[in-house]
Design a protein with these regions (language model features):
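Short secondary-structure capping micro-motifs at structural edges
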Residues: 36-37, 74-75, 104-105
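Bacterial N-terminal signal peptides that target proteins for export
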Residues: 1-9
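Extended amphipathic alpha-helical interaction segments
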Residues: 83-106
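Sec/Tat signal peptide C-region and signal peptidase I cleavage site
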Residues: 18-24
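Bacterial N-terminal signal peptides
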Residues: 9-17
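N-terminal, post-signal-peptide region of Sec/Tat-exported proteins
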Residues: 45-79
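Immediate post-signal-peptide N-terminus of mature secreted/exported proteins
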Residues: 25-55
């Protein structure tokens, strides 16, 4: 097969790749921000997630973390709700630090 005959296929393939929607992976429950948040909650160390937010947002993250840790101790349902609250807060602040809007966890 001649190299020139592959060009149309390569061009079409590139067009499909470029047209694919790009999602913000950091918004995902399986993304790096929420993964770090899970680790932080399980270890009790809020410093593990501070790399994901701007310095100006660290106090809000620490407050949300402390609230989540306190509520997690109540029962399994409270734990799930507290975790979700912390994930939402962290991802929202992370996206704001990137200058992007927050549209919820994916």
């Amino acid at each position: 097969m001649r190299p020139r005959s592959l060009f149309p296929f390569a061009a079409i393939g590139m067009a499909f790749l470029m047209a694919a929607p790009v999602a913000a992976h950091c918004d995902g429950l399986d993304g790096p921000v929420v993964t770090a948040a899970r680790t932080a909650l399980d270890s009790g160390d809020p410093n593990l997630v501070l790399i994901w937010v701007q310095p100006r947002d660290e106090a809000e993250v620490r407050q949300a973390f402390a609230q989540a840790i306190a509520v997690r101790k109540l029962n399994a349902q409270a734990r799930d709700l507290a975790d979700r609250y912390f994930f939402e807060t962290l991802v929202r602040l992370h996206r704001a630090g990137e200058g992007e809007t927050y549209t919820g966890l994916k």
